[in-house]
Amino acid sequence: MSGHSKWATIKHKKGETDAKRGKLFSKLSRAITVAAREGGTDVNMNIALANAVEKAKSESMPKDNIERAIQRGGGGADGVSYESILYEGYGPAGVAIIVDVLTDNKNRSAADIRNIFSNHGGQLAQPGAVAWVFERRGSVVVDGEKYSEDDVMAAAIDAGADDVVQDGEEFRVLTQPADFVAVREALTAAGIEFGQAELTMIPKSSVKLEENDARKTMKIIDALEDSDDVQEVYANFDIPDDILERLAG
């Protein structure tokens, strides 16, 4: 699991405030609505919508909220046009960062992202500056205490998964983006329940951080994730688990 994924998992386990959960659900709802508007409301025919819905489910977003977001997308334009933009930059100690934004005002978003980088010891970069550090992959997390590696491997690899990696008490099934839905469906058909399932950006290499730089990096990551227009933040840091636990505490 990447350092950023570990950070997100630790924060999720420790719980978030109602305000933060509300903001997260608002972002997830926006992503679902835009996906439904652009590709239709049938999750079986709209991969982007299926991914957005799976992401919402993995974050325990209520079913009614998800259905309302889909209905809004299917109801036509509501006067608001959203644009998806990727920003790239560097955090403290040279950590590569990609920020996935969904916004109705790109000038506002650009200024906000630039200020966050500047105020937290980072630097916004030109498009392409850090994108090469990451690769787009599908990721499905399975509870390793409930299922054996052989069972997960058999279902996933036969459906086109690239690999099944053990990470602590979990198995992480990795796929190419085009195979993500098929692998997810194969796991379900095999009776294997899974947690987080998403298309994500996985770093090809990582920057190892000690506590001082780790603290600075977590501050810029948290600030970016707290921005209203930011959907996802990807970073290539590698921080020891004990330090992550202390910082999350």
Where are the regions that the model predicts?
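Positively charged, low-complexity, intrinsically disordered RNA-binding extensions
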Residues: 139-249
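N-terminal cationic and glycine-rich segments that engage phosphates or anionic surfaces
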Residues: 1-116, 121-125, 130-139, 208, ...
